[in-house]
A protein has these predicted regions:
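Hydrophobic structural segments characteristic of membrane proteins
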Residues: 265-268, 282-382
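PAS-family sensory modules
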Residues: 1-40, 157-170
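N-terminal hydrophobic signal-anchor/signal peptide
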Residues: 1, 34, 46, 102-189
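Short, glycine-rich, amphipathic interfacial segments at transmembrane boundaries or analogous
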Residues: 212-272, 332-348
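Conserved helix-loop-beta segment at the catalytic/binding core of cyclic-nucleotide signaling proteins
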Residues: 40-45, 74-105
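A hydrophobic, helix-centered structural microdomain
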Residues: 168-243, 361, 366-382
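Conserved long alpha-helical elements within nucleotide-processing catalytic cores of c-di-GMP signaling
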Residues: 15-40, 44-54, 58-78, 108, ...
């Protein structure tokens, strides 16, 4: 790139064009992405939103030929944004961004005015072809996550720290996937007699299909069809469970415990929807076996966070969403072997995040080895 190329990153993470004099500092890609991550974490903690504007110049070739393009873009930003806003490279020499801190979302005229002014300045400063190539993206956290549509995949743009961590561990993720495929195929073959016996028992003891299918929310908010052996009567009412899940996530379940002893559990006890055979299947976790098919399909892993139901995600707090981004859902996980259903919801999410951020093949092996004991002797299964 000619006049718009950047100098090497300085010690404070600031990049500036070589002929840029008197302009507001522009953070380097590394520093700006770190800024986005810190601002998001602040928003998760305080519930105060922020906004991110990204401007893509269209193609690097255009910028190489027209070195003024980036200077015009940065000049427009300099003339429009507030003193408290932060400018930086989201992708060096390709996408520039602005973090708008301390915003008020309800009919906020300030942001609308800023965006309109930036567009107007660029339209006046660039020729029509250059302006037509520019793409604008505007994201608001946490409102960018539509709570009424939890099946919409999340936007990784606001989570550069997670994206970086996953990119740096591609080999580990590929190895984990290989183990999932080989493990699920082996277990499906070995346990095929158990599948047949359980399926026959379900058909003989209650009306309805052998398999229970339910829409669950997977990695990055992607929905998938979750499989279990049916343990409930058909045509049951889920309203009580929906309300209990809402109370549990809100931290109110201890006041009105499902098991009557003051402990909060994730699953309802004395649930009249469950068949007598279903209670046995759940106690031994045999109802979970069809999830090996989900693992083979790549929708789940042998080890990972529990995949949530849609109405559960609708009740999530902002920081709870991280469990959908950090790891693929699994059949068993750290929280399951740390108390199973009796772990409080916030603690369950913390254990899921702890697992994802400290993941290793050895940790997966430990969890898999501890799972049979948790199934046989744990008191939390229902």
């Amino acid at each position: 790139m000619s006049s718009a190329s950047t100098k090497p990153r300085s010690a404070n993470g600031v990049s500036q064009p070589q002929n840029w004099v008197g302009f507001k500092e522009v953070l380097s890609e590394e520093a700006f992405r770190r800024m986005i991550s810190l601002e998001r974490k602040r928003s998760e903690r305080t519930q105060r939103p922020f906004a991110l504007l990204l401007i893509d110049a269209g193609c690097s070739q255009l910028c190489d030929k027209q070195g003024r393009v980036w200077l015009d873009i940065l000049s427009a930003l300099q003339g429009a944004i507030r003193e408290t806003d932060v400018t930086g490279w989201y992708t060096t020499n390709s996408v520039v961004g602005v973090v708008f801190t301390e915003i008020v979302l309800d009919n906020n005229p300030v942001l609308s005015t800023i965006l309109s002014r930036i567009r107007a300045l660029l339209r006046d400063g660039l020729d029509a072809d250059q302006f037509s190539r520019i793409k604008f993206s505007f994201l608001v956290f946490p409102d960018d996550w539509d709570s009424q549509n939890p099946e919409r995949p999340s936007n990784p743009t606001l989570y550069p720290d997670i994206e970086k961590r996953q990119e740096s561990n591609r080999l580990g993720r590929a190895t984990k996937r290989l183990i999932d495929v080989l493990g699920s195929l082996s277990l499906l073959a070995i346990l095929s007699p158990v599948f047949f016996i359980v399926a026959a028992a379900i058909k003989l003891t209650s009306r309805g299909p052998v398999l229970f299918r339910q829409k669950r929310i997977g990695e990055h908010g992607t929905p998938f069809t979750f499989l279990k052996f049916r343990s409930m009567y058909i045509n049951n009412d889920s309203s009580e469970h929906k309300e209990y899940v809402r109370q549990l996530i809100a931290g109110q379940a201890e006041k009105k415990s499902a098991n009557g002893n003051g402990e909060s559990v994730f699953k309802l006890t004395n649930d009249l929807r469950i068949t007598p055979l279903g209670r046995i299947l759940r106690r031994l976790s045999l109802d979970e076996l069809p999830q090996l098919i989900n693992v083979l399909r790549g929708e789940m892993s042998l080890v990972g966070p529990r995949p949530p139901i849609r109405y559960e995600v609708e009740a999530y707090e902002v920081w709870h969403r991280l469990r959908l981004l950090e790891a693929k859902p699994g059949i068993t996980g750290l929280w399951q072997v740390s108390g199973r259903s009796r772990v409080k919801f916030d603690d369950m999410v913390r254990l899921d995040l702890q697992y994802a951020r400290n993941w290793s093949l050895w940790l997966d092996i430990i969890i898999l080895l501890r799972t049979p004991a948790a199934v046989l002797f744990g008191e939390g299964a229902h």
